[in-house]
């Protein structure tokens, strides 16, 4: 499971097994350690985020904080996604 970066006590990462065909580029965010019930954000072609799910039940304030941090690091996310999976597509 590639860990892309850390924001305070939150890990932003993607799973090594992201299904076949490969899902569009996205990351999971979890406090403490990666978990299967993490919150998921799609990365759009324009570099913005879309909330795919909030399985971690974070507050709107926390979701906004995570979304902004993910958008600020979109280039790193996309680079690491391509390095790991060798291909990329976008949700929209």
Per-segment meaning from a language model:
Residues 19-60:
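A short, structured beta-strand/loop element
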Residues 54-92:
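Acidic, low-complexity intrinsically disordered segments
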Residues 4-7, 15, 44-46, 53, ...:
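Surface-exposed loop/turn and secondary-structure junction residues enriched for glycine/proline
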């Amino acid at each position: 499971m590639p860990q892309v970066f850390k924001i305070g006590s939150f890990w932003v990462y993607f799973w090594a097994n992201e299904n076949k065909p490969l899902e569009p580029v996205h990351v999971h965010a979890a406090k403490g350690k990666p978990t299967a019930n993490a919150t998921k954000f799609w990365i759009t072609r324009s570099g913005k985020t879309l909330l795919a799910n909030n399985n971690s039940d974070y507050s709107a304030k926390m979701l906004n904080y995570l979304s902004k941090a993910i958008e600020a690091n979109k280039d790193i996310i996309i680079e690491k996604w391509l390095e790991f999976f060798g291909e990329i597509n976008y949700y929209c």
